[in-house]
Amino acid sequence: MSFTLTVIGGGHAGLEAAFIASKLGLKVNLLVLDPNHVGSCPCNPAIGGPAKGIVTREIDVLGGMQGKAADATALQYKLLNSSKGPAVQAIRAQIDKIAYQKWFRQQIDQTPNIELIAGEAVDILESNGKVKGVVLADGSELASDAVIVTTGTYLKAKTYCGSLSKEEGPDRAKRSEYLSTNLIKRGFKTLRLKTGTPPRILRESLDFSQMAVEANTTPHLAFSFTTKNYLPLEQQVICHLIHTNPQIHQLILANLKQSAVFNGSIKANGPLYCPSIEDKVFRFQDKERHQIFVEPESLSLETVYLAGFSTSFPPEVQEHIVRLLPGFKNARFQKYGYAIEYDAFSSIQLKSTLETKLIQNLYFAGQINGTSGYEEAAGQGLIAGINAALKLQRKPEFVLQRNEAYLGVMINDLVTKEISDPYRLLTSRAEHRLWLRNDNLQERLIEKSRALGLVEADVYANYLEQQQKKKQLIDYLQTTTVGQIAALKLNFKNTAQTLFDFTKRAEIKLVDLVQLLPKRFDLDVQSLNQIDIDIKYAGYIKKSEKYFKSLNNLSSVKIPLKLNYHKVPNLASEAIVKLSKIRPTDLSVASQVAGINFNDILAIKHFLDNHE
């Protein structure tokens, strides 16, 4: 039986939703305001970063597109936090944003069951609490078995640059006028959020000799496990690093009231972890400088992006400030920075599948849920697309737990916690970040992906081969002692210790140890490092697994959406209020809600057991 899905929006969330649903057999209508903006990167020309880069790789293991697109259009890679522990390391890629868009358009053209449609969605068609399609601005209708709304920052969007404001989307694009109004009429709770972007400067007007070079020094980096050819270090573009100075800070503070963020024009909440330059200078007046990265946007563009310098100052103030930066004395502007506010919707109105609780087969993904970032959006689009397909095909839902993926952490946060400012994924949000690492994506997720039919055969075959090689090395380490290795027995007293336990020492690196072994193992550096990390952190990871095993069992206990918590004996009043508002779908989700303790969970479980 054939099913049709309509995805509203062709940004990072919409694209993942469309492609994964098409892979799972659905016919997809990809409805966009402007086909020329499909896959656009209206803010930073980069994919990845702390936690975010791990999400991009999780998306890849689960059959998604973002990692492949980034690898196909990368200009430079970096392994972030390489000097720190493995839990916080992640890949970030500078991408060619024009090539990135072209890559996605080519993929759409080559996918028969995705139809790109230009039009504006103004309302949802609904019957008996179930979505039936989409109403377009011209009065036409798209019949659909499911709908995923991925409207990004376009809902009633408004841009600000000084005292000037315009009703428009990012990059002067047409905004979505009516959809959020009609969703509100259907009972959805909205909130107003804000983000911003820096000015774009013509690179030929800059003196790069006054800037520090930021080059990649780590070879063999890629997001996707399907990427065969790594971008050579010598072919990677150079980014630059500069800093603000006290003179700039004085100018910013003297002109604060000209910024739309400070003059009262903008009422919406902005991102806590990505503030504007004026906000940073105002909030951290004890800091003498703030770092700014100068990044190319595309090989086909003459502009650079000032990462860390988003602003809503008027053009003349932006010019004065920017020209005080090192190397920017003669800077010429291609586009001024601006702030943008938009409608989003409270994500606690969603199930863990990202289906709305109010209307069946209607899903929200991306910035409409109050998140920020391309990676967060793409991850939600992927999960929404998978679950839309599974539900229509009457298959079990796909929900990742907090100990399985950053995607699980993010979605659990979204559906259990009220969002007041744009949500950004951070390693600190993951209580089990020692397990949710950049190096063990396949071990965590590939079998789940294979169960969905989303893993390429050659990728899975290579994974099994690598697992067998890893097992051979681990078996050797567990059965061989220090005393059996000539290069070790003279330098270490405990010769009866196995090499496995010997590797647990912080100063021992497995990549060096294998060079001393008489037996050779055909494993690359990445695989050796992963084994090394697993050995060193095995104790911590075991504790983590034991703790979450109890929560995973709770996920099998479903909670009726209409449960009257006032009727649950011995349930704390705080739990009644919070659970009545959030409406968790199972006990595992309920246990993650702030203020809910184990006794509350036991009370609910006992009540459900006696009222089946």
Curated annotation (Swiss-Prot):
List ligand-binding residues for NAD(+). 270-284
Describe the task this protein carries out: NAD-binding protein involved in the addition of a carboxymethylaminomethyl (cmnm) group at the wobble position (U34) of certain tRNAs, forming tRNA-cmnm(5)s(2)U34.
Tell me the cofactors it needs: FAD
Pfam families per record: GIDA, GIDA_C_1st, SAM_GIDA_C
Full protein name: tRNA uridine 5-carboxymethylaminomethyl modification enzyme MnmG
Q: Write out the entry's keywords from A to Z.
A: Cytoplasm, FAD, Flavoprotein, NAD, tRNA processing
Q: How does it assemble?
A: Homodimer. Heterotetramer of two MnmE and two MnmG subunits.
> Which NCBIfam families does this chain map to?
mnmG_gidA (TIGR00136)
Q: What HAMAP family has UniProt attached to this entry?
A: MnmG_GidA (MF_00129)
Recall the GO molecular function terms of this protein's record: flavin adenine dinucleotide binding
One biological process GO term for this chain? Answer: tRNA methylation
Grouped into one coarse class, the protein's main location is: cytoplasm
Q: Which GO terms describe its cellular component?
A: cytosol
Compartment annotation:
Cytoplasm
Origin species? Mycoplasma pneumoniae (strain ATCC 29342 / M129 / Subtype 1) (Mycoplasmoides pneumoniae)
Residues bound to FAD are 9-14
Q: Which InterPro entries match?
A: FAD/NAD-bd_sf (IPR036188), GIDA_C_N (IPR049312), MnmG (IPR004416), MnmG-rel (IPR002218), MnmG-rel_CS (IPR020595), MnmG_C (IPR026904), MnmG_C_subdom (IPR047001), MnmG_C_subdom_sf (IPR044920)
Instruction: State the similarity comment.
Output: Belongs to the MnmG family.
